[in-house]
């Protein structure tokens, strides 16, 4: 089992899968929370635009549209949300940097599933970059920052938490304390210490190339495994081994992690669920004469 410790409090469209975990049915929804845009050069790092632009669209300002999907997993007695999108509490100046677009919201997507924020029992944050945890905290009627999911326990890896508290200069703009400190102060934040099973059929594994302690969910049953790849593979276009995101803090480690994961995904025919690819929601890994590649499902 995954080892969890607890923090001490201070004074859109869905893709539905059902997996039988041997105890009950897991209902899995890939839900949309809206889109944002980032520079293609930053997203694809050292890969020349002449190559990546054949695989992913950019506008005349070199901006690529990116989805912000969350994963909703429902079991008999748990409703687990993985990531919360960018949220809506930041000011207009902040949002203007990221060209938000799309009609979907996290609240609206949950409503389409017949759920309210109060129904969520667990919120897993893959990491604490603003586009993954911004919706974890909201303003209440009195203007106080409070957990958006009042009945939920929140989870993040211990390594990511420490990384966010002491960010490096390169990553600092991605960490906004108002997105996660209110969770700690409310006493509802728990820390994942190691890889392991969160609930039956639902395993969390850590990767460290993009950022320290990135949590990646694996959902398995009867020989089928779905992986919500988060920023391990932002787009299907990032599957080729040397196509490493420019935002990754340890690109050589990303290469190692990708090589091992892609070989595993190929051998086991994993279904990959993409969080940021605006055009491909699900895919598989194949091997060609050029190496690992992705095929959309």
Give the residues covered by each predicted segment.
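C-terminal regulatory/interaction regions
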Residues: 4-12, 16-24, 255-257, 262-297
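Metallo-beta-lactamase
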Residues: 19, 87-88, 98, 101-115, 119-131, 146-206, ...
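Conserved beta-strand hairpin/beta-sheet module of binuclear metal-dependent hydrolase folds
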Residues: 19-27, 33-113, 216-231
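Short, P/G- and charge-enriched loop/turn segments at secondary-structure junctions
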Residues: 56-61, 142-143, 204
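Residue-level marker for buried hydrophobic side chains located in beta-strands
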Residues: 80-82, 124, 154, 226-228, ...
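Metal-dependent catalytic neighborhoods of phosphoester/phosphodiester hydrolases
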Residues: 133-144, 284-285
